[in-house]
Amino acid sequence: MAVEEGQVLPGHALPFVGDCRWLISLDYDDTLRSDDAEQPVSDSFYELMRSWRAYGVRWGINTGRTLPYLCSELLPTAPFLPDFICTCERYVYIAQEDGKVSPLVEHNQRCYEHNMCVRESVTPLLHAQLLLLRQRMPELQWIIAPDDPLSVEAENSQTMDAIMAFLAPFVSSLEGVAPQRAGRYMRLADSRYCKGSALRSVAEQWRVPSSHWAIIGDGHNDLRAFQLFPEAFCGAPSTAHPDVLAWLADNGGCISSTPGVMEILYTWKPLHMTES
């Protein structure tokens, strides 16, 4: 079943009783997601989330992917839905009392309208800069995303490093606009919306303070969330971008010795979680 941005998701989150005490926000690509195409999220992760219900834990995926792109891979093998999903670093979907995961309609519409204004005003300016980039650094391999004129897809993360360095003076001159970067992908967006602000919108629904959040991710869009909420438990897999690893090392965050999220989650539990 195809899923479109803005719809109620098919399926249900696990039943939840009592107050939400803890929130776990997980990046998807290169963090929660494994390389196993047949089982992109491990059974052991789902079983852990099931067992942590007793601690008042809700969990979700906070990604730069669109909802259709995420769900096309996640839903066929997921035994239950996340309690929340944040897509494109801004749109929010949250589990209701019946377990259905539904969009925060007013929030999402506001995000859409604000970002359409950015698209209208910034697209010609960005494309002029990208033309200069093509002329001055023709060896770099990249494209403008076919479905978003403010998104750039590079050959690899190192190429995106070079692109971001070239665009930095231009981006810093834009009022109310910020880059959202994940590895080899980057989009310009309204600076009011990012993974951190999306997670805050989720937490407000369940009244969970940021000191009771765990934020796990590997990219610059996750780093921005770490910087906005350093009081949260922040962690990254061993494969995270060097900028992310450096910030965590300097600020007492958790760096896994392996790819994935399980080691980080097992580190977080004894430090913070107790049964009510």
Each model region followed by its residue ranges:
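Mg2+-dependent phosphoryl-transfer enzymes with acidic/Ser/Thr/Gly-rich catalytic loops
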Residues: 19, 189, 196-276
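Short glycine-/acidic-enriched loop or helix-start segments at secondary-structure transitions
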Residues: 35-36, 70-72, 96-97, 225, ...
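Active-site phosphate-binding/coordination module
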Residues: 41-140
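Short, aromatic/basic amphipathic alpha-helical patches
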Residues: 74, 164-170, 242-252
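Conserved acidic, metal-coordinating active-site core of Asp-based
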Residues: 127-228
